[in-house]
Amino acid sequence: MIEMKLWKKWLTTIVASLSLCIAPAAMASAASTAQILLYGAATMVLAKQQLLQMDNNNQKQMLANTQAKTGVVNNEAYSDRLENIQRNLVATGLIKRNYDVYANPSTDLNAFETIGGVISVNKGMLDALNDDELAFTLCHEMQHGEKRHAINGVLKSIGISTLVDVSLGGNADVLDILLGSVAVNYIDNEFVTMDQEKQADATGFNVFKNTAYNVGGAASSMQYVYEQYGELWQEGFKRI
């Protein structure tokens, strides 16, 4: 992992070199602006690297933290159903990551994927959808994981100004703590772009059509949720 101090040293060198090209009258303000922009860009890169490491290596911890936050449905029938569908999707050879999938007790029609390849499906969705529809839902959520959408969502939820403040503080441990906390709480208010949703639908369907499930389950699952919530089906997500 690249230490924050190395980033600061690198940026200070760049800002100093920039000052040689700036007229004296504008040097102070321009250097300050350049420094902020450079620190912001570098911190975004560093934060993304750390989140990628969490996404790849912290699955057990993220699973435990997420389950503690959402609760878990201890129902063998639900667990077996999810495991069976997941196994069928993985058998296509088109799923590259490992996912931990579990049911939570919420009665809302929803499911989510978060840092660590953790996927949670609400009890309400398990009760409402048949296996074809649920399989497409899991295809969709797995594609969020394959494309690392949660990483970008966490970065957006923190904001560039907060990352710059942490960077200028020079304490890498603070950034670790911040990212860990936001990653766990991210499930309460996901930042998912409409382009990411469309991508998850399209690439998810590419997986889905290579299974034995009825491809009509893709359309019927989305139609069912729309009929229940109308335009409010997006509630709980920040769409950009």
Q: Residue locations for each model-derived region?
A:
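Helix-centric, low-specificity signal for extended rod-like, repetitive segments
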Residues: 1-2, 232
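A Zn2+-metalloprotease active-site environment signal
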Residues: 25-240
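Bacterial N-terminal signal peptides
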Residues: 13-22
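Bacterial N-terminal signal peptides that target proteins for export
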Residues: 2-14
